A protein has these predicted regions:
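A structural signal for multi-pass alpha-helical bundles of membrane permease subunits
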Residues: 2-251
Length: 251
């Protein structure tokens, strides 16, 4: 019962490490994925060649359909320290590094690599949503602004981004609802060498339940309830901020 929460909050340093990692990885991932999706959608919107635009759009969106097991296998191969690791081979060939880098096995590089992999896999979903919004902006607005002397930058600031604002906030809140759910993406890329920077609440629960001979289902259930509570608070907080900024929320 409540004893589990007392233990969790006062006596378990590993829980707090996992909680900090969860918030850090989740929030940075959310910001990077949303920002990358906005930038890519704006760039794609400038492409006038429809066939080329469709091709690039498909390439960007395709990783979203891949399972995390497949994605992790691909990146473990290309980031390998062996001869099969094309990234290390390329960097050493260019003289950038002298020795191979353990991108997924070094605490200095794991987080950056994790964020890059997440952006590569998940950006396409947001890009589709933002492109759909951009296609709904009336060309008359751009023509009128151009006649008034607005350059491309001003048209972006005063027409495009305000039109995207509602979609950006909606996507942000929808992704925020999943902000505490990092198990699969972390589990397939982490290892014991980087556990201090990669262990999140869900992998902590997994290790506590299945990785030791003394499993405590009551305690791990308490951790799961705490994770769900924090996720709910984040969503409600973001929705409240949306009401203050836009005058309405989506929840």
């Amino acid at each position: 019962g409540l004893l589990h929460f007392n233990t969790m909050f006062t006596n378990d340093v590993f829980f707090w490490d996992a909680f900090r990692n969860t918030l850090l990885l989740s929030i940075v991932k959310l910001i990077l994925n949303t920002g990358a999706a906005v930038i890519i959608s704006l760039l794609l919107n400038e492409i006038t060649n429809l066939a080329f635009k469709k091709t690039v759009q498909t390439i960007v969106y395709l990783p979203h359909f891949m399972s995390w097991v497949v994605v992790a296998s691909i990146f473990r191969l290309i980031l390998s320290v062996n001869s099969s690791g094309m990234i290390n081979q390329m960097l050493m060939g260019m003289g950038v590094i002298d020795n191979p880098i353990f991108f997924l096995g070094d605490v200095r590089y794991w987080r950056g690599t994790f964020f890059f992999i997440n952006v590569w896999k998940d950006t396409g979903w947001g890009t589709i949503l933002f492109l759909a919004t951009l296609s709904g902006i009336s060309p008359d607005l751009y023509e009128a602004a151009q006649i008034d002397g607005a350059n491309r930058w001003k048209r972006l600031i005063y027409i495009t981004l305000p039109a995207l604002a509602n979609t950006i906030i909606t996507v942000f809140i929808l992704n925020l609802a999943k902000v505490m759910n990092l198990f699969e993406s972390v589990f397939v890329t982490m290892n014991d060498a980087v556990v201090n920077v990669s262990n999140v609440l869900q992998t902590y629960v997994y290790r506590k339940t299945f990785g030791s001979g003394n499993s405590d289902y009551g305690y791990t259930t308490a951790v799961g309830l705490f994770k769900s509570f924090v996720g709910m608070i984040l969503v409600l907080g973001c929705n409240y901020a949306s009401k203050k900024v836009r005058g309405r929320g989506i929840v």
